[in-house]
Swiss-Prot record:
One of its GO terms (cellular component) is plasma membrane. It comes from Edwardsiella ictaluri (strain 93-146). The keyword Cell division applies. Belongs to the glycosyltransferase 4 family. MraY subfamily. This is Phospho-N-acetylmuramoyl-pentapeptide-transferase. Catalyzes the initial step of the lipid cycle reactions in the biosynthesis of the cell wall peptidoglycan: transfers peptidoglycan precursor phospho-MurNAc-pentapeptide from UDP-MurNAc-pentapeptide onto the lipid carrier undecaprenyl phosphate, yielding undecaprenyl-pyrophosphoryl-MurNAc-pentapeptide, known as lipid I. It is a multi-pass membrane protein. GO terms for biological process: cell division; cell wall organization; peptidoglycan biosynthetic process; regulation of cell shape. The keyword Ligase does not apply. Its EC number is 2.7.8.13. The gene is mraY. Its cofactor is Mg(2+). The chain crosses the membrane at residues 27-47, 72-92, 94-114, 132-152, 168-188, 199-219, 236-256, 263-283, 288-308, 338-358. It catalyses: UDP-N-acetyl-alpha-D-muramoyl-L-alanyl-gamma-D-glutamyl-meso-2,6-diaminopimeloyl-D-alanyl-D-alanine + di-trans,octa-cis-undecaprenyl phosphate = di-trans,octa-cis-undecaprenyl diphospho-N-acetyl-alpha-D-muramoyl-L-alanyl-D-glutamyl-meso-2,6-diaminopimeloyl-D-alanyl-D-alanine + UMP.
């Protein structure tokens, strides 16, 4: 909204023209979200401790996690607040793509909040009933998917970009809605599954958001889009502001979530962040790229699917415990080692994903 204000003030002082530059707004969006998150952290943690809103640890989990019982959770509230304020300050309010991401972010945040509330206040370790969680995730995803289809059905915004092939971009039509639905819901749940160790989910989220921010900048620039042979999407540039806000809020949260964590993000954070990343990828037509960049999330999800499938079909487990980060814990890896190695893998995958934009 400051952009609109600056447009009115620029006639009085030309210096306000800096607010029209995307790179400037991206940087200050990151810093704004970072500082808000750092400011909120101690206050939110103190408030959660006062209300005794602490993590509920399952009895069948790794023994090393029993010491985490009672650690404040629902810290995702600081992430969502930081992102929302920063985006509203620095993005163009007229951009429909920005509102699509915010709708998913806040909608999934509410679903996650209800889930966390049932866990930590009602002391129900199962949280929100799975079918109801999936129902509301589906409703939100379908509303946004249909909205995005209506916005972009007559533009390249409904094409499917295939890595390594610059001339293969099929027009999806109504299938765009179905694909968008699965990407948004799937990414949301994948990040949620990854959020099992201190800082494990937030850094891959930061890396992927940073990578998607670069893609958004290229997609919204007609010259770079043509150079990289990706669809030029007029509204996509403003998603850079959303991505940098996620990066800033994520780094601010990591300040308090790094091992040993002072606060956990809870489902209010993980479901919302995953949904936001999925929505951004769909808007940029980079669903395949998200699979590469978010490979850690994919790996965690596949480990659960394989574990459950193997146990039901053969009566045997593939891993000592799923998601796979627990498998390495039970193998004797210290928690910080698991976390940092997964971070390194995530960074490598984001760089590989960015490289695929040119390798065509």
């Amino acid at each position: 909204m400051l952009v609109w204000l600056a447009e009115h003030l620029v006639k009085y002082f030309s210096g306000f023209n800096v607010f029209s530059y995307l790179t400037f707004r991206a940087i200050v969006s990151l810093l704004t979200a970072l500082f808000i998150s750092l400011w909120m952290g101690p206050r939110l943690i103190g408030w959660l401790q006062k209300l005794q809103i602490g993590q509920v640890v399952r009895n069948d989990g790794p023994e090393s996690h029993f010491s985490k019982r009672g650690t404040p959770t629902m810290g995702g509230l600081m992430i969502l607040t930081s992102i929302t304020i920063s985006v509203l300050m620095w993005a163009y309010p007229s951009n429909p793509y920005v509102w699509c991401v915010l709708f998913v972010l806040l909608g999934y945040g509410i679903v996650g909040f209800v889930d966390d509330y049932r866990k930590v206040v009602r002391k129900n370790t199962d949280g929100l009933i799975a079918r109801w969680k999936y129902f509301w995730q589906s409703v939100i995803a379908l509303v946004v998917a249909f909205t995005m289809y209506c916005i972009g059905k007559d533009t390249p915004a409904t094409q499917l970009v295939v890595p390594f092939f610059k001339d293969i971009m099929p027009q999806l039509g109504l299938l765009y809605i179905l694909l968008s639905y699965f990407v948004i819901v799937g990414t949301s749940n994948a990040v949620n599954l990854t959020d099992g160790l201190d800082g494990l989910a937030i850094m891959p989220t930061v890396f992927v958001a940073a990578g998607m921010g670069l893609v958004a900048w290229a997609t919204g620039n007609v010259n770079f889009a043509a150079y990289l042979h990706i669809p030029y999407i007029r509204h996509a540039g403003e998603l850079v502001i959303v991505c940098t806000a996620i990066v800033g809020a994520g780094l601010g949260f990591l300040w308090f979530n790094t091992y040993p964590a002072q606060v956990f993000m809870g489902d209010v954070g993980s479901l919302a962040l995953g949904g936001a990343l999925g929505t951004i990828a769909v808007l940029l037509r980079q669903e395949f790229l998200l699979v590469i960049m978010g490979g850690v999330f994919v790996m965690e999800t596949l480990s659960v699917i394989l574990q459950v499938g193997s146990f039901k079909l053969r009566g045997q487990r593939i891993f000592r415990m799923a998601p796979i980060h627990h498998h390495y814990e039970l193998k004797g890896w210290p928690e910080p080692r698991v976390i940092v190695r997964f971070w390194i893998i995530s960074l490598m995958l984001v760089l590989i994903g960015l490289a695929t934009l040119k390798v065509r």
